[in-house]
Amino acid sequence: MIAIIDYGMGNIRSVEQALKYIGAAYIVTSDKEEIFRSDGVILPGVGAFPKAMDILEEKDLVRMLQEIGRSRKPLLGICLGMQLLFEKSEELQDCNGLSLLPGVIRKLKVPYKIPHMGWNELKKEGEIALWNGVEDGSFVYYVHSYYADCPNEIVYGISDYGVKVPGFVAKGNIYGAQFHPEKSGDIGMQMLKNFKGVVETWKSSQLSI
């Protein structure tokens, strides 16, 4: 069972429809017990970083997400949800994040239209489980004005938008997509299927303990 965290700032319906399409068992929830009982977690998000962190604090979800991130349970952040995984953001004000990944969220300063909205090529950097069946140079769908300034060793996908935008990051059980896999057609569905596979593998490992 995958828990989609509903904290009032996510593109919940599109993520829900995508998981339904790939045949994944899921629940939409902000209940800590349900999230803890899940086999994997998706943290979506659209909006401002400081407001999102305030809401997660109000719902007492920050420490729980940090505990999940430090366990081996698969966690996928999407768009703003990915940005929240980092140490802090410069959006509107300096604001601490979940600190599960090293790096800072900074505003895009490029000679192009902001937000970066639409399809862009994703160049793979290294291999991870979520790349199975995903071709290098596939196009994915973005909507964002900020990007992750982070170490190269956690970057597994890059798009060019005047700067090298980390489109996909990963460290251990933690994954983050700056783009929207649920809006990225067959490629996005394949990545979500791969995440589902990672979740199922983790679940099987827990049953054997």
UniProtKB/Swiss-Prot annotation:
Domain Glutamine amidotransferase type-1: residue ranges: 1-205
This enzyme's EC code(s): 4.3.2.10, 3.5.1.2
GO terms of biological process kind: L-histidine biosynthetic process
Keyword Repeat: no
Alphabetic keyword roster: Amino-acid biosynthesis, Cytoplasm, Glutamine amidotransferase, Histidine biosynthesis, Hydrolase, Lyase
Record localization: Cytoplasm
GO CC terms, sorted: cytoplasm
Active site residues per record: C79, H180, E182
Amino-acid biosynthesis is among the record's keywords: yes
Gene Ontology molecular-function annotations: glutaminase activity; imidazoleglycerol-phosphate synthase activity; lyase activity
Pathway(s) annotated for this protein in UniProt: Amino-acid biosynthesis; L-histidine biosynthesis; L-histidine from 5-phospho-alpha-D-ribose 1-diphosphate: step 5/9
Stored SUPFAM superfamilies: Class I glutamine amidotransferase-like (SSF52317)
Database matches in InterPro entries: Class_I_gatase-like, GATASE, Imidazole-glycPsynth_HisH
Principal subcellular localization: cytoplasm
Subunit structure: Heterodimer of HisH and HisF.
Function: IGPS catalyzes the conversion of PRFAR and glutamine to IGP, AICAR and glutamate. The HisH subunit catalyzes the hydrolysis of glutamine to glutamate and ammonia as part of the synthesis of IGP and AICAR. The resulting ammonia molecule is channeled to the active site of HisF.
Protein name: Imidazole glycerol phosphate synthase subunit HisH
Species of provenance: Bacillus anthracis (strain CDC 684 / NRRL 3495)
